[in-house]
């Protein structure tokens, strides 16, 4: 996916040249940033983007208080995401979107268990603290800590047991989540206009 943004950079609170440099420095050709659309109803759409191209830098800011700029961006996943939806306990989840959502469990580390819509039941022994269990198919229940580091010891207890779960959008799916577990679901869209 690619697109462009046309913006007005203003000198509110700081010199225009400083504001413009700060705006441009926020973009990278190699390090993805988040482009976020906030709707009037409070919902959001996000996409990770990198800089594809930008207008040439102005030769002078003298006497200017506002300047138009255009940024061209690219995304390599082809997916917009909605805001995180959280669930606890025994719940029926219906997720909007065009594609299966991203799902993970936030686990506070206590001994507990859960049952997925596929019927798979998993018991968790007491763990080392708050962890996230990736429920996406192919991630095989990868366990990470709050900093995103893989917890290989805890993950090894799930290997061969948990291969992941795929939910289809707009279908009802029942989860049984034990104490200390929170399901985090992120809808995926092909367009931000959903």
PLM region spans:
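Residue-level signal for secondary-structure boundary sites
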Residues: 13-15, 43, 79-81, 113
């Amino acid at each position: 996916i690619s697109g462009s943004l046309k913006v007005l950079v203003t000198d509110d609170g700081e010199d225009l040249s400083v504001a413009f440099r700060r705006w441009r420095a926020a973009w990278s050709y190699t390090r993805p940033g988040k482009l976020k659309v906030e709707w009037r109803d409070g919902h959001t759409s996000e996409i990770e983007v990198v800089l594809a191209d930008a207008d040439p830098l102005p030769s002078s800011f003298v006497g200017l208080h506002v300047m138009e700029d255009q940024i061209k961006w690219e995304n390599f996943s082809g997916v917009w995401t909605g805001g995180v939806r959280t669930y606890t306990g025994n719940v029926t989840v219906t997720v909007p979107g065009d594609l299966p959502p991203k799902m993970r469990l936030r686990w506070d580390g206590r001994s507990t268990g859960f049952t997925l819509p596929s019927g798979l039941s998993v018991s968790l022994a007491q763990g080392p603290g708050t962890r996230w269990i990736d429920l996406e198919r192919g991630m095989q229940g990868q366990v990470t800590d709050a900093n995103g580091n893989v917890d290989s010891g805890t993950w090894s207890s799930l290997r061969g047991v948990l291969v992941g779960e795929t939910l289809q959008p707009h279908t009802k799916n029942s989860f049984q989540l034990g104490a200390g577990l929170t399901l985090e679901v992120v809808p995926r869209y092909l367009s931000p206009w959903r």
